[in-house]
Amino acid sequence: MSTDPDEREVSPALTVGDGDVDVSLRPRSLREFIGQPRVREQLQLVIQGAKNRGGTPDHILLSGPPGLGKTSLAMIIAAELGSSLRMTSGPALERAGDLAAMLSNLVEHDVLFIDEIHRIARPAEEMLYLAMEDFRVDVVVGKGPGATSIPLDVAPFTLVGATTRSGALTGPLRDRFGFTAHMDFYEPAELERVLVRSAGILGIQLGADAGAEIARRSRGTPRIANRLLRRVRDFAEVRADGVITRDVAKAALAVYDVDELGLDRLDRAVLSALTRSFSGGPVGVSTLAVAVGEEASTVEEVCEPFLVRAGMVARTPRGRVATALAWTHLGMTPPAGANQPGLFE
């Protein structure tokens, strides 16, 4: 049975259920932002340098997997600069005119945030080049031989672009960002701090051991950690006394099919098919997807990245292969010759 990737509790993508709660949990300053110490230090220098000069910072590109806080950092950058934030996304900018309208409404020192900037349409991207470099755009009026280009000045602004696929950016666009930061997955200890902060904001009684239990199942992603915290809260309020202990957390996550390594039903189905149906592989992703009743894109884009990062699946020229860790996680004996990478190697 096909699964909507956004319905998974361990999906790093923003879901409808995250909504207003996700907004309420966002940090509002670099001091409040947990994790990514190197990125925070670098951004602090970029922001403070611009404030000292009384100018606008260089354009900033934030890259990394979904759910790590790129949008939160864009909001923080604007707040730290004391500037207004204008938000849009790459898919929303289908025409150059869409971008021109947004740029013409900017005032000096505004921060323009474009999420999924790698998906911006080519005509809009080409207009963005000139705006980023010279703070102007050329608007074409008319068609055919009679068309004329009218230059329009744009107020000096800072573009913050966010992408989960930095390699998909064109060279000319990437080169126009003065500062690029890559965000890494969080360590369990950092996620535990995120959970403690979120629990305080939401008024949740969270035991220390319970925070650690949820953190290690959160795939290194704060958005997943906060979502699991809300699901465990529901369980604690309905089936316990409202206090989240380690045992309550374990019982709740078992109900939601999230195991001790953060794998859910779909992840385990992929591993089970790979080991039991295909003897560990190699097997092509399309064949593997048919075996679990999913789209190939779901297996490749939703399940596989975490399974590879966790050291349970290896990509080879001949197809996907289950590692020794995948066999042992399913309670099976690895066949002779299975490689044995450590977790997250």
From Swiss-Prot:
Major localization class: cytoplasm
Head domain (RuvB-H): annotated segments: 260-345
Region (Small ATPAse domain (RuvB-S)): 187-257
UniProt cross-references to InterPro entries, sorted A to Z: AAA+_ATPase, AAA_lid_4, DNA_helicase_Holl-junc_RuvB, P-loop_NTPase, RuvB-like_N, RuvB_C, WH-like_DNA-bd_sf, WH_DNA-bd_sf
GO cellular component: cytoplasm; Holliday junction resolvase complex
Region (Large ATPase domain (RuvB-L)): 1-186
Compartments where located: Cytoplasm
Keywords of the record: ATP-binding, Cytoplasm, DNA damage, DNA recombination, DNA repair, DNA-binding, Hydrolase, Nucleotide-binding
Class of the enzyme per the UniProt entry, highest EC level: hydrolase
Residues reported to bind Mg(2+): 71
Pfam family, one: RuvB_C
Catalysed reactions, as listed in the record: ATP + H2O = ADP + phosphate + H(+)
Cross-referenced CDD domains: AAA
One of the protein's GO biological processes: DNA repair
EC code(s) of this entry: 3.6.4.-
Binding site for ATP: 25-26, 67, 70-72, 133-135, 176, 186, 223
Chain sites annotated for binding DNA: 315, 320
Entry keyword Cytoplasm: yes
Role, per record: The RuvA-RuvB-RuvC complex processes Holliday junction (HJ) DNA during genetic recombination and DNA repair, while the RuvA-RuvB complex plays an important role in the rescue of blocked DNA replication forks via replication fork reversal (RFR). RuvA specifically binds to HJ cruciform DNA, conferring on it an open structure. The RuvB hexamer acts as an ATP-dependent pump, pulling dsDNA into and through the RuvAB complex. RuvB forms 2 homohexamers on either side of HJ DNA bound by 1 or 2 RuvA tetramers; 4 subunits per hexamer contact DNA at a time.
Family: Belongs to the RuvB family.
Subunit description: Homohexamer. Forms an RuvA(8)-RuvB(12)-Holliday junction (HJ) complex. HJ DNA is sandwiched between 2 RuvA tetramers; dsDNA enters through RuvA and exits via RuvB. An RuvB hexamer assembles on each DNA strand where it exits the tetramer. Each RuvB hexamer is contacted by two RuvA subunits (via domain III) on 2 adjacent RuvB subunits; this complex drives branch migration. In the full resolvosome a probable DNA-RuvA(4)-RuvB(12)-RuvC(2) complex forms which resolves the HJ.
Domain notes per entry: Has 3 domains, the large (RuvB-L) and small ATPase (RuvB-S) domains and the C-terminal head (RuvB-H) domain. The head domain binds DNA, while the ATPase domains jointly bind ATP, ADP or are empty depending on the state of the subunit in the translocation cycle. During a single DNA translocation step the structure of each domain remains the same, but their relative positions change.
UniProt protein name: Holliday junction branch migration complex subunit RuvB
Organism this protein belongs to: Mycobacterium marinum (strain ATCC BAA-535 / M)
